[in-house]
Amino acid sequence: MGLSDGEWQIVLNIWGKVETDLAGHGQEVLIRLFKNHPETLDKFDKFKHLKTEDEMKGSEDLKKHGNTVLTALGGILKKKGHHEAELKPLAQSHATKHKIPVKYLEFISDAIIQVLQSKHSGDFHADTEAAMKKALELFRNDIAAKYKELGFQG
């Protein structure tokens, strides 16, 4: 399940493009998540009042949270699978405080892929998509294992 050095390099290359505008990418990821899976919005008290895409686009709080999400994910990706220290507190908060099901992590992974395809179509080739999907799956599997350790059946 691990990624090769070459696959990690591909992931980090495309992630470098994301880092030029973490807040913008993050906001777009969350908007796609909420549009594609409106039930996920119930987990975000801060954003429940945002009913339209325009309201979401105008929300500085949504943009800030998108930045937070992608900053955390970038820190994990840069560890190239050696992300135990970064993952533990994230799993803890998402299992015990936020109660985010693993399924929702799949949904946001899909949204990330869609945003990368949309914003970086010239650089997001089949090998890039495959490597990123593999990295996100590794992240989700490791979060799911932590959830299990914590007794969260998300």
Swiss-Prot record:
One of its GO terms (molecular function) is oxygen carrier activity. PROSITE patterns: GLOBIN. O2 binds at H65. One of its GO terms (cellular component) is sarcoplasm. Heme b binds at H94. Belongs to the globin family. This is Myoglobin.
